[in-house]
């Protein structure tokens, strides 16, 4: 049997602890909404497709019929809701003694971890962008040299043309921007990726200095004549994202490599307008917090529960490099 907590401390009750946890969650600013579209849903399963596109208008005679666009569904991704939980327990003796403040700290930390877990789970897509799994609907990694087109047209890529994974630099980023821009829809229609919106350079903390120097220096880095910095004029938003780094990949079992430096050289160039069309975070609701006491064991529990689905229905608006100088062929 479980009942609400009682305590000599008025705030150390189920409602009081839940209030602590809710307040702590509000203090955390998640990163994933900068890259993903956050949607609410009531569906257990939900399918989404990649961009097929509508063709441009054709010139016709004044009384001619309108050319009808061919309907084509792109590659599919199924969003399946998953449940995430964590709880902590504290004995009554600890609550009655001078460890009261630890109860408060731990309950707040649990709530913060719930908020952070959304970032951890969402950015697994980027941590595994070059790996064998998961593959997006076309059967390829998120970053690939051979994304097939649904209409059977020539395969496309969203990394360097020769597959060499160049390190982050002023010139290499321009080459990657060329790759980002030169894309066609699944019907072979040119898409205006990277042309009409602000770009985002997403890096691990390892690359933070190089990224900020590239994006914000007045002159071109490394030049003596202080020529105008293209990237500052381009107005690139730098996102230093710890959740795409080695330590999170290793913690989540996504890599067995112990070469942290090599892993953290990776970086991504995004057009958020298009990236948010294919990157979705679908939640049933905001995560729940609960606190209670078992009146038999006198053990106090606090629990968080979250239900959401993360996925990607396409790769348009996303380009990337491992940055380690290897040749990538996937």
Pin down the residues of each PLM region.
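Intrinsically disordered or highly flexible coil/loop and linker segments, enriched in small
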Residues: 26, 30, 37, 41, ...
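Short active-site-adjacent helix-start/loop capping segments
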Residues: 53-55, 96-98, 307
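Internal, conserved structured core segments that host functional sites
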Residues: 125, 129-148, 169
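Sequence/fold signature of self-assembling virion shell proteins
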Residues: 2-6, 143-186, 195, 200, ...
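Assembly/oligomerization interface modules of large self-assembling protein complexes
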Residues: 22-84
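Long, contiguous amphipathic alpha-helices that act as assembly "spine/axial" helices in icosahedral shell
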Residues: 77-134, 201, 302-304
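Catalytic micro-motifs at enzyme active sites that drive phosphoryl/nucleotidyl and oxygen chemistry
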Residues: 72-78, 122, 187-189
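N-terminal alpha-helical "arm" segments
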Residues: 1-29
């Amino acid at each position: 049997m479980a009942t609400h907590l009682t305590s000599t401390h008025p705030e150390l009750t189920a409602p009081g602890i839940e209030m602590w946890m809710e307040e702590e969650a509000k203090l955390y600013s998640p990163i994933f909404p900068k890259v993903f579209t956050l949607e609410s849903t009531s569906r257990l399963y939900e399918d989404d497709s990649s961009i097929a596109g509508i063709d441009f208008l054709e010139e016709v005679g004044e009384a001619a019929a309108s050319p009808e666009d061919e309907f084509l569904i792109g590659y599919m991704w199924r969003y399946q809701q998953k449940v995430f939980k964590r709880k902590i327990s504290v004995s009554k003796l600890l609550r009655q003694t001078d460890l009261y403040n630890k109860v408060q700290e731990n309950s707040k930390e649990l709530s913060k971890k719930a908020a952070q877990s959304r970032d951890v789970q969402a950015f697994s897509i980027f941590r595994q962008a070059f790996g064998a799994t998961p593959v997006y609907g076309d059967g390829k990694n998120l970053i690939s040299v051979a994304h097939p087109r649904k209409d059977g047209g020539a395969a496309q890529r969203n990394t360097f043309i020769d597959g060499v994974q160049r390190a982050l630099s002023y010139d290499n980023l321009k080459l990657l921007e060329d790759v980002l821009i030169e894309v066609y829809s699944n019907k072979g229609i040119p898409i205006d990726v990277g042309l009409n919106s602000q770009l985002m350079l997403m890096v691990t903390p390892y690359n933070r200095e190089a990224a900020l120097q590239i994006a914000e220096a007045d002159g071109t880095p490394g030049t003596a004549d202080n020529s105008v910095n293209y990237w500052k004029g381009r107005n690139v938003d730098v996102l230093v994202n710890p959740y795409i780094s080695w330590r999170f990949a290793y913690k989540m079992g996504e890599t067995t490599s112990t070469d942290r430096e090599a892993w953290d050289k990776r970086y991504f160039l995004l057009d958020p307008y298009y990236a948010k069309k294919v990157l979705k975070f679908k939640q049933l609701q905001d995560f729940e917090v609960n606190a209670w006491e078992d009146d038999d064991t006198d053990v106090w529990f606090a629990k968080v529960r979250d239900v959401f689905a993360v996925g990607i229905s396409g790769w348009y608006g996303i380009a990337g490099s491992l940055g380690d100088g290897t040749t990538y062929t996937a």
